[in-house]
Regions:
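Beta-rich carbohydrate-recognition and catalytic domains
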Residues: 1-18, 23-70, 76-173
Length: 173
């Protein structure tokens, strides 16, 4: 059975900081999370990446704000690069942008770094309403389970697709 050895608060700023992921790459620990006013789909929701060598002192190395509700970041380290993927809820085109209804679409984004401090501008990957959840490197390629939905509230019509990429940017079934 696992035993908790220590517990340390990394961020305490009064915001809703959640949906974390963590990895170790090139001698540093990386922690990413979403920061927002609340749990709900209420822009702004930004993705933050922190870096540490000792798990005690943390430095912010990236903050992503695509204009929508950015959330659920996931880190991937593969050789000489570190990537973060995240989903962004955006008001559906030509709607009033109400945050209380289901007129939002989901875009998956990726940002890549070769040094852990300089990150590319987030780029949309794959199609609208496909959430690329957790990327893995295996067999000389990148793989991802992506779930798809036409509308956010239509849970009965969700499907899952296995996607493959050679470069993290172009994904195929």
């Amino acid at each position: 059975m696992a035993e908790l050895i220590s517990l340390q608060r990394v961020v305490s700023d009064g915001y809703h900081n959640a949906f974390t992921d963590m990895t170790r790459w090139n001698g540093h620990y990386y922690l990413c999370y979403r920061v927002a006013q609340s749990h709900g789909i209420e822009p702004p929701g930004d993705v933050i990446i922190l870096r540490s060598t000792d798990l005690t002192q943390w430095q912010q190395v990236a903050r992503f704000d695509t204009g929508g509700d950015d959330r659920d970041p996931k880190l991937l380290h593969a050789g000489d690069l570190l990537a973060v993927t995240f989903g962004t809820w955006v008001p559906r085109w030509r709607t009033a942008g109400s945050r209380t209804d289901v007129t939002h679409d989901l875009l998956s984004h990726i940002s890549i770094s070769r040094d852990g401090t300089s990150w590319s501008t987030p780029r949309q990957i794959y199609g609208v309403n496909y959430w690329l959840w957790r990327l893995v490197a295996a067999d000389g390629a990148y793989w991802c389970a992506a779930y798809h939905f036409g509308r956010r509230d239509d849970r009965d019509m969700r499907t899952v697709h296995l996607l493959r990429s050679e470069d993290l940017l172009d994904w195929r079934l």
